[in-house]
């Protein structure tokens, strides 16, 4: 645990969400908060590809979030873009060639949805589930710039978590962290399978 001061700008973006009440409170004082480790893939064997390089980008755009949901991408404990950048450079081994592997995040959706909680006297004796966090990512890998041809694969992964109303900011971030880890783990498995099946011209087997 590390004592850190949270950036108030993130809380302003989230104004009205369940996370906002915790983050705005943290703006006023130092709070013992967990520093979350990056999600990495160095323990997995890289996929060798005959490409000159790998480039990563988020082309998903701002996206439309309909009330009562809130966009929480700016308050996640780890960055989906940074995580996929780590994935691309740790899981794809560019051996050299004429093409480039473009790893594009085409969907990057993380929202908080408020849930109805019990009100009145009964609510004083219950600990209701107060928010649901929903995440979804779609990643597309394109091989471009190779005179021999082009190719692409795509995979999507989604997950959700619900949290009770008495959860602290650290507990809420733990739920978000676990959700992101689940999403990228599934993306890793699906993308590698798609690459081996449909980008075999560039994937070096062995």
Give the label of every model feature segment.
Residues 2-18, 22:
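N-terminal secretory signal peptides and thylakoid transit peptides that target proteins
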Residues 99-152:
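Surface-exposed short loop/turn segments
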Residues 74, 149-189:
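Short secondary-structure boundary motifs at beta->alpha junctions and helix caps
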Residues 45-114:
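N-terminal segment of the mature soluble domain
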Residues 192-206:
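Short, highly charged C-terminal tails/helix-capping segments
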Residues 23-43:
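Bacterial Sec signal peptide processing site at the extreme N-terminus
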Residues 21-26, 119-123:
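Surface-exposed flexible segments
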């Amino acid at each position: 645990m590390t004592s850190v001061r949270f950036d108030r700008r993130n809380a302003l973006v989230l104004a009205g969400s369940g996370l906002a009440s915790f983050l705005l409170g943290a703006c006023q004082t130092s709070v013992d908060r967990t520093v979350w480790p990056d999600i990495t893939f160095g323990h997995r064997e890289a996929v060798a590809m005959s490409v000159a390089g790998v480039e990563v980008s988020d082309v998903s755009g701002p996206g439309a979030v309909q009330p009562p949901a809130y966009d929480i991408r700016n308050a996640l404990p780890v960055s989906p873009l940074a995580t996929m950048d780590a994935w691309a450079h740790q899981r794809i081994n560019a051996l050299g060639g004429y093409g480039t592997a473009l790893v594009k995040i085409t969907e990057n959706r993380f929202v908080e949805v408020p849930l109805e909680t019990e009100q009145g006297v009964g609510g004083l004796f219950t600990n209701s589930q107060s928010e649901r966090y929903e995440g979804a990512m779609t990643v597309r890998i394109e091989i471009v710039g190779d005179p021999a041809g082009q190719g692409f694969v795509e995979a999507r992964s989604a997950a959700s978590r619900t949290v009770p109303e008495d959860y602290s900011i650290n507990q809420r971030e733990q739920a978000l962290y676990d959700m992101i880890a689940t999403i990228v783990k599934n993306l890793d498995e699906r993308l590698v399978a798609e690459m081996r099946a449909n980008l075999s011209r560039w994937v070096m087997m062995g």
